[in-house]
Regions:
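Leucine-rich repeat
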Residues: 8, 14-17, 29, 37-42, 52-53, 61-66, 76-77, 85-90, ...
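Consensus "Asn ladder" position of solenoid repeat domains
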Residues: 5, 26, 50, 71-74, ...
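Membrane-proximal C-terminal cap and juxtamembrane stalk of leucine-rich repeat ectodomains
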Residues: 116, 121-158
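Repeat-solenoid scaffold signature
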Residues: 91, 95-126
């Protein structure tokens, strides 16, 4: 448990067999692409409520067992293409309370086990073409899209 420790980077020497990593409420503004390298057994990860502005490509590539990912309460403005592609076992993704304006086409397509995604309280820009992917994805997966209370979100809200 590394929450609320004023950390500015992921601590070194995290055991490779770690299953749960709680890094919420720290002082991260960025994460290096190798921050979670070797943590192939990780099933639960929270880097929520930091000040992370962007995610590097490849950040989650080795987290092939990850089931829950909490990124809410940061300052994410965009997501790199393919950032979630290796997370095929993911069942929950929280992206609410960021500054996202759109998501890359196909961002959630490989998340075939996803049961819950939270996208509320972002700054969605409905004038950009990229928002069409998100709108269509939400319409096709509306039962998975939840608000902050866990209730299904109205797909017409996007």
């Amino acid at each position: 448990d590394c929450q609320s420790k004023d950390l500015t980077s992921a601590p070194p020497g995290i055991p490779a067999d770690t299953k749960s990593l709680d890094l919420k409420y720290n002082a991260f503004t960025q994460l290096p692409s190798d921050a979670f390298q070797g943590l192939t057994a990780l099933t639960w990860l929270s880097v929520s409520n930091n000040q992370i502005e962007s995610l590097p490509a490849g950040l989650f590539d080795q987290l092939v067992e990850l089931k829950q990912l909490y990124l809410q309460g940061n300052e994410l403005k965009s997501l790199p293409t393919g950032v979630f592609d290796s997370l095929t076992k993911l069942t929950r993704l929280d992206l609410d309370n960021n500054q996202l304006q759109s998501v890359p086409h196909g961002a959630f397509d490989r998340l075939t086990n996803l049961q819950t995604i939270r996208l509320t309280s972002n700054q969605w820009d409905c004038s950009v073409c990229e928002i069409l992917y998100l709108s269509q994805w939400i319409r096709g997966n509306s039962a998975k899209v939840k608000d902050s209370s866990g209730q299904m979100e109205d797909p017409d809200g996007v």
